[in-house]
Amino acid sequence: MPYCKLLAFLLSISSAQFAWCAASNEKPLLLRHPTISRTRIVFTFANDLWSVSRDGGDAVHLTTGIGVESDPIFSPDGSQIAFTGEYDGNIDVFVMPAAGGTPKRLTYHPSPDRAIGWTPDGKQVLFSSNRTSYSNFSRLFTVPAEGGPETQLPLDRAVEGSYSPDRAKFAYVPTDQWQRAWKRYRGGQTTHLAGHALRFERAENPAQQFE
């Protein structure tokens, strides 16, 4: 089943569960930030990461320590999970085995760093940060999954993004808008998609809008 269809199915199931819980006076659970591999679904609940089989069943804890975990993202081969962790007042990028284990910290900057993806080869984690922006705009960086120095992407500003399979092009969202959840919103703050040819360092903006 294609990922987009699976997400639509999960949302429909979630809505049905919510309605059932309301009818039976049970409290619904706020499950957020789903990421999907070929066999597992990882999500956040109560500031922790949880994992469940795509076929259904009981969810298991992946993180139980003191702190807040969010934004889990499977590596391309499904063996690792990158996520955003907030511990001791700082927000950084971490990576851990998909089956569970000790998280490895990848970023150490005092500015907030948030995991948003992987490079196609699964060797580096993509994250956003405002660490190099005096105007507080977010920019995108990569950091080796094994640890090491960060590399900034050649983009003036970006909050989300994804590589093409050959890593030659990059699609991204330049700025974040709170109206992004409005369907068919066409006002001045609507979110736009932009593309960047990484091999030639030539940017273009198709000004596409989310429907």
Where does each model-flagged region fall?
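Beta-strand-rich domains and repeat architectures in extracellular enzymes and scaffolds
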Residues: N25-V52, D71
